[in-house]
Amino acid sequence: MRLFLSLPVLVVVLSMVLEGPAPAQGAPEVSNPFDGLEELGKTLEDNTREFINRITQSELPAKMWDWFSETFRKVKEKLKIDS
């Protein structure tokens, strides 16, 4: 009885699998499969360049360097006094 029911189900499943993708699921016109990846890379490159330019043109790196230098100098002086 089980075999009698499972064979038609198996035939239907195999026919669906072998039929291939539906037209809506078919791949769009594929001129180059890496076009999307290339576009993503260019966008990422542009955003990274813009971010680096913003950082180099801002005063933040200079202020941070001054703060670290001053803090290091203070710690160094404290260690000299305590030793």
UniProtKB/Swiss-Prot annotation:
It is found in: Secreted. Residues 1-26 form the signal peptide. Keywords: Lipid transport, Secreted, Signal, Transport. Pfam families: ApoC-I. One of its GO terms (cellular component) is high-density lipoprotein particle. The keyword Signal applies. GO terms for molecular function: fatty acid binding; phospholipase inhibitor activity. GO terms for biological process: lipid transport; lipoprotein metabolic process; negative regulation of cholesterol transport; negative regulation of lipid catabolic process; negative regulation of very-low-density lipoprotein particle clearance; triglyceride metabolic process; very-low-density lipoprotein particle clearance. It comes from the Eukaryota. Apolipoprotein C-I is present in acidic (APOC1A) and basic (APOC1B) forms in P.paniscus, P.abelii and P.troglodytes and perhaps also in baboons and macaques. The two genes for ApoC-I arose through a duplication process that occurred after the divergence of New World monkeys from the human lineage. In human, the acidic form has become a pseudogene sometime between the divergence of bonobos and chimpanzees from the human lineage and the appearance of the Denisovans. Pseudogenization resulted when the codon for the penultimate amino acid in the signal sequence was changed to a stop codon. Belongs to the apolipoprotein C1 family. PANTHER family: APOLIPOPROTEIN C-I, APOLIPOPROTEIN C-I, ACIDIC FORM. This is Apolipoprotein C-I, acidic form. It comes from Pan troglodytes. The gene is APOC1A.
